[in-house]
Amino acid sequence: NLKIKKMEKIYSKIKPNKLLHIINRLSDIHGRNDVVPEENFIQCATLKMEKNKTFPPHKHITKDRHYQEQIAQESWVVIRGKVKCILYDIDDTIIAEPILEEGDASFTLYGGHTYEILEDNTIVYEYKTGPYEGQKLDKTFIK
């Protein structure tokens, strides 16, 4: 009697309309789904595809963009092992502690996070929006 975990969208308790974190589960992937709302800096879609599926060859266009504010948004995708996410609200209080298993992904749009590795030899892919301009301009630590 396995309980299937589903996608979680975690909103701020301080600003209830502000989406802070998304947890996407391997079991959530059916067809194409845009996981992160399009107004965010980081983008992710999941695609479940059958053999012989193809896409038209293409390249992406360079754009000249100027933003008033830009934040580094980050994602972890668990390839092997298990990871506990500790997710923070915008006031630095812990808001959720989901467990990621193989094929699951976390997305931090706003708020903070840390991770606890629960199994030896855990492997993750980490994705962040760039460009990276050094730790001083990228993050502040939560006490």
Language-model segments: residues:
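Short beta-strand His + acidic residue motifs that chelate non-heme Fe in jelly-roll/DSBH
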Residues: P57, C85-I86, S106-T108, H113-E119, ...
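Glycine- and acidic-residue-biased ligand/ion/polar-headgroup-sensing regions
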Residues: Q70-Y88
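Short acidic-glycine-tyrosine-enriched beta hairpin
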Residues: D89-Y110
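A short, N-terminal "cap"/entry segment at the start of jelly-roll beta-barrel domains
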Residues: L2-K51, K143
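Conserved short histidine dyad/triad with adjacent acidic residue
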Residues: L47-Q70
